[in-house]
């Protein structure tokens, strides 16, 4: 019985550690979003958050909205706590309802990978380092639907590599994080609530050479050209009550 209790406490501690790591990541992104919205950084309103197991990996989603009156900045954030088995081209997007307008060309995105790299240095020592690669996605590289209600980015999930040589270079990818951000405003003074939606589409099989159609509105998801069962999706909704 004591052993069972000990294992149970151990599981609780592990979950708490994962939650703390997730919170630190979200706080880091929140700081970046707030920096972009410095003049309007009055109130930060997070969504409840959503998590799921996709293709052997653990994915977290959350939406952060920073408001000042009826103007705001909003970021949809994803985090792969553990990466999925199959890694190809994924997509992540953020959309809004029709009660709001986007500040022209304010949208942007960013994603990053953390990994360990092992190699032989100039002193002929075999070392392992922790690194992070960060990629910015400017406005003109984002995808958007025909009505401009949503913005999304496509990116590849990295594959780890192990050297066949005893002291060759090996790379082990650990996690991935990213966000899509834009600035907006509420159109009508009579509006009392606003919805935003974040959607992650993970390609889990390479059988179809299919892709995602971003030309159609994706209020609650993307349009998959064909073989949509080859994609796994996770969504999050943010309700802002004014």
Which stretches of residues belong to each language-model region?
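Intrinsically disordered, low-complexity regulatory regions of eukaryotic regulatory proteins
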Residues: 40, 131-134, 211
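Short N-terminal edge-element motif at the start of the domain
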Residues: 14-119
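Generic structural motif
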Residues: 64-68, 79-83, 97-99, 162, ...
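Glycine- and small hydrophobic-rich membrane-insertion segments that are intrinsically disordered
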Residues: 149-151, 155, 159, 194, ...
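Intrinsic disorder/low-complexity segments
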Residues: 22, 36-39, 153, 157, ...
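Short helix-loop boundary/capping segments
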Residues: 94-195
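Single conserved hydrophobic/aromatic residue that forms the stacking wall/gate
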Residues: 2-13
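Short, low-complexity, Pro/Ser/Thr/Gly-rich segments in the mature regions of secreted, periplasmic
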Residues: 228-242
């Amino acid at each position: 019985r004591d052993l069972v209790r000990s294992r149970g406490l151990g599981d609780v501690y592990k979950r708490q550690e994962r939650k703390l790591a997730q919170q630190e990541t979200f706080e880091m992104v929140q700081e970046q979003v707030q920096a972009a919205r410095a003049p309007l950084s009055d109130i930060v309103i997070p969504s409840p958050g959503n998590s799921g197991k996709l293709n052997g990996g653990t994915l977290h989603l959350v939406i952060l909205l920073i408001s000042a009156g009826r103007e705001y900045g909003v970021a949809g954030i994803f985090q792969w706590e553990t990466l999925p088995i199959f890694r190809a081209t994924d997509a992540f997007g953020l959309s809004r309802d029709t009660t709001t307008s986007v500040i022209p060309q304010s949208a942007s995105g960013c994603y990053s990978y953390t990994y360990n790299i092992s190699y032989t240095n100039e002193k002929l020592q075999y070392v392992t380092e922790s690194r992070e690669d960060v990629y910015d996605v400017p406005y003109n590289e984002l995808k958007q639907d025909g009505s401009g209600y949503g913005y999304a980015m496509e990116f590849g999930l990295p594959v780890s590599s192990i050297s066949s040589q005893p002291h060759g270079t090996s790379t082990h990818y650990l996690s991935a994080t990213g966000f899509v951000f834009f600035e907006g405003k509420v159109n009508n003074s009579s509006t009392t609530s606003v919805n935003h939606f974040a959607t992650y589409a993970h390609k889990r099989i390479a059988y179809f050479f299919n892709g995602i159609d971003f030309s159609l509105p994706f209020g609650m998801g993307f349009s998959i050209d064909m073989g949509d069962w080859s994609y796994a999706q996770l969504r999050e909704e943010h309700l802002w009550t004014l």
